[in-house]
Amino acid sequence: MKIAIEGCAHGELERIYDTIACIEKESNTKIDLLLCCGDFQSTRNLEDLQTMAVPKKYLDICTFYKYYSGECVAPVLTIFIGGNHEASNYLQELPYGGWVAPNIYYLGYAGVVNVNGVRIAGISGIYKGHDFLRGHHEFPPYTESTCRSVYHVRQLEVFRLKQLSGKIDIFLSHDWPTGIYEYGNKAQLLRKKPYFAADMESGQLGSRPLEELLKAVQPSYWFAAHLHCKFAALVPHQNATKAPTKMGDGSSSSSSSSSSESDDEESTSRLPPKPVAVTKFLALDKCLPRRAFLQVLDIPSEAIEGNPTFEYDAEWLVILQSTNHLISVKENYYYLPGKKAGAIAERFNFTPTEEELDSLTTKFQSLKIPENFQRTVPAFDPQEQSNYKHMVVGQPTAHLNPQSNTFCSVLGVDDPLCLALLANGKDLPAVADQCQDQEPIEGSSPPPEPLVTPSKRKLNLFLPAPTVTADATAAEKDDSVIDLPEEDEDPKTAETAESEAVDNPKVKAVPPPPSSPPSVKKLKRRNQNIYQAEDDD
């Protein structure tokens, strides 16, 4: 199966798909799958755009809305993870993954799927140590703080991915694992990015949780982005503890596999040593001319005619189900179970057992991922909103997606967004239905099931009745526009600064008409920085 890997998409879907079409034409081959390593920017409209954590002068609607509205259709199955420049409100509606547009699938906070038998895992976001131990407490409309923390990696997703057994063919992340540069051409990397040297020396370049995942999961391929350069590495694994297992055979216990290895150690002592398992790591650039942003690989897969088979991963579904009680939506730190739990007899190994895998068949008769995408909000209108960069638009309120509602209902897990809203005394909105101003999409799902709310036992909260009035809610909505300061999420680079050195044109204040009375009170402008002669960013 031919798979195209994209670094940072930055909303340039048309250019990416055009590049794939050129490759197919020149090589006379068909690309079966596109994987994107973050900064996808699935902005459906101007409200989504306000939740993206970038300074206002860099906000760009790009082209995703065309695929969301149905004006364009993705020519190849596309799977992506989130980065640090996303329509966070939309992705937060799909914590366990789902379709953001026809033929475009988001993996969720973390996820595992199978395409033609190729097992693909991924984790969204970037690592920031001060948020890693927190729960998923954010919900829209965001504050200046939560607009950024919402895409920071949390310990729960890393913990869940560590429970996987068997072979992982491909792993996707936005960040690089810490220390990955030691396994490639470090000198060449520093010639391209000399400002990486300080972070390398301090151990700050990359994500430490991803380094742990790399050692635990040991995938055949690991693809990343974020640092806007191409870099390859070969990572050997001396201790291959992950025993390959078939989905559903139940032989996934790490303890049993380790004991069997020790039993066979003496009998195989005279045999030649086994080849050391190696992970092939590749980071790619962002979608710009003359940049290495796309790579095509040919990976062995099941021979299937027609469209690729796209399925849930049985082991991952069981892990989600068995760790549902570990979800936290609190802002304070909390800790997950581990081996050193003292006298508390709490389960810490959630690698699925044979019985747990067998019980999954009662809930999922088929692992095929349903094509149940629905448009739930109006898409951007380029004719009516052509001057959008000078418009004042507020953030949207929280929405519940019918895909997540159905998934949570069938699997018996909680939607973290629902929990966060309830924990903060908010009323749950109704599950979004098919957008009324657009035609239904062929193959879309039937009307969503009734909203599944978390049980009182799960929440373990005693919440007062909401005290926010309608007037207060309206006032809050007026203040939902936030002006984000610059934040160094990425290492500063000369080429990045050059590519982003674009300022908004000045906006002149229009004087009142002559008939206006001279005594009109002058009001203070909201978002005054938009009207300044010079930008501070």
UniProtKB/Swiss-Prot annotation:
Name of protein: Lariat debranching enzyme
Source taxon at top rank: Eukaryota
Keyword field: Hydrolase, Iron, Manganese, Metal-binding, mRNA processing, Nucleus, Zinc
Entry binding sites for a divalent metal cation 1: C8, H10, H228
Enzyme class, broadest EC rank: hydrolase
EC number of this enzyme: 3.1.4.-
Organism, as annotated: Drosophila pseudoobscura pseudoobscura
Ways its activity is controlled: Active in presence of diverse metals including Fe(2+), Zn(2+), Mn(2+). Binds two metal cations in two adjacent alpha and beta metal-binding pockets.
Region Disordered, residue ranges: 242-272, 473-537
Role according to the record: Cleaves the 2'-5' phosphodiester linkage at the branch point of lariat intron pre-mRNAs after splicing and converts them into linear molecules that are subsequently degraded. It thereby facilitates ribonucleotide turnover.
Cell compartment(s), UniProt: Nucleus
Ranges of compositional bias, category Low complexity: 251-260
Upper classification of the organism: Eukaryota, Metazoa, Ecdysozoa, Arthropoda, Hexapoda
